A protein has these predicted regions:
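A short helix->beta-strand "capping" segment at the edge of beta-propeller domains
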Residues: 105-121, 372-389
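Conserved blade-ending motifs and adjacent loop-strand segments that build the rim/top face
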Residues: 57-71, 285-296, 393-394, 423-431
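Blade-terminus and WD-like Trp-Asp/Gly-His loop motifs, strongest in beta-propeller folds
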Residues: 26-33, 69-74, 124-131, 164-173, ...
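Extended, small/polar residue-biased N-terminal targeting/export presequences
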Residues: 515-570, 637-663
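A flexible loop/linker signature enriched in serine peptidases of the S9 family
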Residues: 1-5, 9-11, 16-25, 35-47, ...
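Terminal targeting/pro-maturation regions of precursor/exported proteins
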Residues: 459-534, 538-540, 563, 567-569, ...
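PDZ/PDZ-like domain segments forming the peptide/carboxylate-binding groove
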Residues: 551-611, 685
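Cleft-lining beta-strand/loop regions that shape enzyme active-site pockets
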Residues: 581-588, 602-793
């Protein structure tokens, strides 16, 4: 943790005046004492260190809220505690005084308003006849006409968050999830009007999603306690179908006859397996094997198939930097044949049963049978793969003759009878009405309703969402956001004991500040203080809906400039760039640009630089815009020439790149080229790239310094550790080369040292722990924080 030090310039010595594991910060020197705040007693208080006696005393004794933002004018200290401002005069010896501050305000930021919410859509569900949609937007549920009619806000609850609205297949009700009671519950709204009905009561955790049974009698939901729960839509009675100790359930769907459900469940080997469950007998049966990851199961509307995706295509991609491989794009679309007498829909036509049911018209859905028959014995062996290239798929709908699915950002259809694949729409998602006649597309913030498409569709007129207007009352909304955040941690934090924190007491402590929140920034601050009590990493506060000012990017030249006495600007230094990266482009260092250090910039776009107080006023808005510079080797317009450059928006990457290059040179020089150096900026793609960029060319070094200081984190540190741990167990040689190779490839067997500091964060914090735990080498520097907790959905 931070300590406070005294530096003596004359003696060139330093003295640590705190030297403990607590956080000691913000020193203020007044007279013979140095005041600072410290959490050595768990709550941040004001302390004073006497420079004469060397003794430290505690000045304040707050036990509930931390002291925040102390500052001094050299005589008086002011600080904030629990939302109030206090003044402390060290000379008087009196207790800190609360300063009563009254600010007159019209409270314009937190006024009630009626807000258009068409840009905040989070979900939608089409009615069975496709004449209307239930649209969820910014915590409200709207009943919206597909073409013409009245848009109705059926919730109007600024103090609650409604979501996942779903129209019942019989068209009589809209179900949705609401936290208006303080917990997430399932609610029902009769489409003819009237008051909504709370269907579930006394729920004890976060409900993930809801799903109607095709007969409209039941509603399924999954929750954060890894349960599948079925609710009777009439009585509200509910039963827990199952609970999985190993993880949550995903993609739970009913069969057409409402007797079965299918879902994905993670196994002990972390492979997702698809199951069917008989709601009548209470028995569960596997659809897929544990050998392959499978997901997204849906029943075909005729009840003959379950369509799903599975990762079974093993197509290795070999690396160029080392002899290694990776598997990606392994997915395919599969069909499970539920009845053992059902033939594969992809059999050649001559091999099919010649007795066929009358064909439905192209625009008619296949009629569902009254009973879905599943022969559970041998079900995992009755799988058929659609002849599609490997990809990232998710099935949408099937009528038993065709399969509509998503691949990346496109919707496609595979005709099981013709064996043909058709692109339906790009840049869109699709859902299908309960009767299988209509499709709803969501694309670029707009909703479109069409007939169930059999060919490529041109999305024409979108559903008019402009009348979706929600009442916003921040005095109700902000406490709801606070409460939902508290519940999210209560239900989702990785340890049920909340790191030993009394989470109910913490809620009460910070909820007391909510009446004083007048902006979203205030709310975010309060939430941040609340979750900080858990002392864990990755506990973020998203800013929410706040007003921001668009920054006009400044054009920068990748150079250090100074003003000459003539009024022109001298180029003191051109920062070198790297040709392999556009983000490391240095405008004045690019080949062919006729300019050098020591030259002068006498005009920008024809405007003399002598006519401005600051040269950068001529570069406002010039980032990534072609700009004309007039330059000369002397501070004069006479003899000057013009060049065209493209200024950059940020010079930090250039400075960072050159800092790394200088470190490499320092290590090279200090070790006579025997030791390599790698700086890893983060544990994401950039950090992985930088490691690879400098690791493989330095495999000839005898030792290696890895620099993890100020690492921004990510998740790739295990990949780095794996490479650093490699030891050769076999050697290779060639008659025509003096080089000796190793198996495994790309090994550096010499000593390794890791540099760290307190800014090494997230996976950049885990990396030094792993480095030390695996015995890779010494770790040098100030300790990292060590409060790493991972992220999950």
């Amino acid at each position: 943790a931070d300590d406070i030090w005294i530096y003596d310039p004359a003696a060139k010595t330093v003295k640590n005046i705190t030297d403990n594991v607590a956080q000691d910060i913000i020193p203020m020197w007044i007279g013979d004492e140095i005041y600072f705040i410290s959490d050595r007693d768990r709550t941040m208080n004001l302390f004073a260190y006497d420079t004469k006696s060397g003794q430290t005393r505690k000045v304040t004794d707050y036990t509930e809220y931390d002291i925040k933002f102390p500052s001094s004018n050299g005589n008086i200290i002011v600080y904030e505690n629990g939302g109030y401002i206090y003044k402390y005069d060290p000379r008087s010896g009196a207790q800190p005084q609360k300063i009563n501050i009254t600010l007159a305000s019209d409270n314009t930021i937190a006024r009630k308003e009626m807000m258009p919410v068409e840009d905040f859509i989070s979900g939608y569900s089409v009615s069975p006849d496709a004449h209307r949609l239930a649209v969820t937007a910014r915590g409200e549920v709207f009943d919206v006409p597909a073409s013409k009619g009245v848009t109705r806000n059926i919730t109007r609850t600024p103090g609650a968050n409604e979501r996942d609205a779903s129209w019942s297949p019989d068209g009589k009700h809209i179900a949705y999830i609401s936290d208006r009671t303080g917990e997430t519950e399932v609610w029902l709204q009769d489409v003819e009007g009237g008051k909504p009905r709370q269907l579930t009561k006394d729920n004890d955790t976060y409900i993930r999603s809801i799903n109607w049974s095709p007969d409209s009698k039941k509603i399924l939901y999954t929750d954060r306690k890894n349960r599948i729960v079925e609710v009777d839509a009439a009585s509200g009675s509910k039963r827990t179908i199952m609970q999985n100790p190993e993880g949550e359930f995903y993609q739970v769907n009913y069969s057409p006859d409402s007797r079965w459900i299918t879902y994905t469940k993670s196994g002990a080997n972390n492979m997702n397996v698809i199951y069917v469950y008989d709601l009548t007998s209470g028995k569960e049966y596997p659809v897929t094997e544990k050998w392959y990851d499978s997901s997204s199961p849906i029943f075909s509307s005729d009840g003959r198939y379950i369509i799903f995706t599975s990762e079974r295509d093993f197509n290795p991609t070999y690396g160029q930097t080392e002899w290694n491989h990776v598997y990606n794009r392994m997915g395919g679309v599969y069909i499970a044949l539920l009845d053992k007498s059902t033939p594969s829909p992809l059999l050649p036509s001559d091999d099919k049963d010649p007795v066929k049911a009358p064909e439905a018209k192209a625009d008619e859905p296949a009629k569902a049978s009254s009973t879905v028959n599943i022969d559970t014995d041998g079900l995992p062996s009755r799988l058929v793969k659609l002849p599609l290239a490997s990809g990232n798929y998710s099935p949408i709908y099937s009528n038993g003759k065709k399969v509509w699915y998503r691949n990346g950002g496109s919707v496609n259809m595979f005709d099981l009878e013709k064996g043909e694949n058709t692109n339906i729409a790009d840049g869109a998602s699709m859902s299908v009405s309960p009767d299988g006649r209509k499709a709803t597309f969501y694309s670029r913030g707009n909703l479109y309703i069409t007939d169930l498409p059999m060919s490529n569709v041109k999305l024409g007129k979108s559903v008019d969402l402009s009348n979706m207007i929600a009442p916003v009352d921040y005095a109700q909304e902000w406490p709801q956001i606070f409460d939902e955040t508290w519940r999210a941690f209560r239900d989702g934090f990785y340890l049920e004991n909340m790191h030993g924190v009394d989470w109910n007491a913490i809620k009460k402590k910070y909820a007391a500040l909510l009446p004083y929140a007048k902006t979203r920034y205030d709310l975010n601050y309060i939430i941040g203080e609340m979750i900080a009590e858990l002392a864990c990493g990755h506990a973020y506060v998203n800013p929410g809906q706040i007003k921001t000012i668009t920054r006009i990017p400044m054009g920068l030249l990748g150079a250090e400039l100074s003003r000459d006495k003539s009024g022109y600007y001298r180029i003191d230094k051109i920062i070198p760039g790297a040709v392999y990266s556009r983000s490391l482009r240095s405008p004045l260092a690019e080949p062919g640009v006729e300019v050098a250090e020591g030259d002068y910039i006498v005009a920008i776009d024809g405007v003399p630089t002598t006519e401005t107080d600051n040269i950068y006023t001529l570069l406002i808005g010039k980032a990534n815009v072609l700009t004309e510079l007039t330059v000369n080797s002397t501070p004069s317009e006479k003899g000057a020439h013009k060049i065209v450059v493209e200024p950059i928006a940020d010079e930090e990457p250039l400075y960072h790149y050159n800092w790394v290059q200088n470190n490499i040179k320092k290590v090279e020089k200090a070790t006579n080229g025997r030791v390599g150096y790698i700086y890893v900026p983060d544990m994401g793609p950039e950090g992985l790239n930088e490691f690879a960029r400098y690791f493989y060319p330095q495999l000839d070094k005898e030792a290696l310094i890895i620099d993890d200081r100020a690492n921004g984190g990510g998740n790739v540190s295990p990949m780095l550790i794996e490479r650093l741990l490699r030891e050769p167990y076999r050697m290779t040689m060639s008659r025509t080369s003096s080089k000796v190779g190793t198996i495994p490839d790309a090994t550096l067997v010499g000593p390794k040292v890791l540099l760290i500091n307190k800014y090494s964060a997230s996976d950049g914090d885990l990396f030094p722990w792993s480095f030390k735990a695996t015995g890779l080498g010494k770790v040098v520097g100030t300790r990292t924080w060590g409060g790493i907790i991972g992220i999950s959905g």
